[in-house]
Amino acid sequence: MIFFRAVGRCVRMVGMFVAAGTELAVKQPETRQERADWLHRFCARAMRGMGIEINVSGSFPKRGVVISNHLSYLDIVVYAAIHPCVFVSKAEVAGWPVVGWMTTMSGTVYVARGHGGSAMKAREGMQAAVDAGLPVVFFPEGTTSNGSGLLKFHSGLLAQPLDGGAPVTAACIRYGFAEDNGPDVSVADDVCYWGERNMLGHIFTFLGLRGVRAEVRFAEEPIEFSSDTLHRKEAAVEARAAVATLRLGNTIVGEERVPR
């Protein structure tokens, strides 16, 4: 049954990509806002197509920077489905199946590790998005995990909001099942994507799951940093603590649901 469900959803997703590509070709969005709006519409449809429910606690900030833990390629789709935004991602994401095309077309700011000028270009891209009135989302862990804890937060991308004065809001994402998928299925292995796993195989398995639920919690207020640009490592510690606090909250029940 899982296999046939996955095949059916794959076919449905192909149709969605064709429709999204056609929309891009016809409307040719030029501004950051138009591209963010396109991604928002596409991701909202994708969530419905995959049968994923999103529960949200708090409000997606209308401007500034959002920092979050990172569990899967799905994180980008979930955040974009909630509200139009711009992402900052590692350059490798551009080569990911499905997600890479989606993020590139929407104007994601990519960071190439080990390239000195890449971080500066990323900061400029972040500032341009903030100036355009769009929230910027990035994942300071720099990679995904199985959700058992928080990895170290990297400090490089915090320079832009610390320098530019943009508010930084902490967020936390996690996943669960509203339906039983059997004893051999777990969120850590079959929803979270981490380690050296084959992405296409993981996506196919994921598409066969039932009752996947994404839960996103936003902090009520932006982080009040005690550190400045010259002490970004301390700021990264403070940012990590803010996200860790959100992770300690109870499972979201009866909160706002993103319309399906």
Q: Model-derived features: where do they sit?
A:
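Cytosolic-facing loops and C-terminal tails of multi-pass membrane proteins
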Residues: K233, E238-R260
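A transmembrane-helix-recognition feature enriched in membrane-embedded lipid enzymes
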Residues: M1-N55, W101-S106
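A cross-family acyltransferase "interaction/gating" segment
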Residues: V99-G100, S148-L230, N250-E256
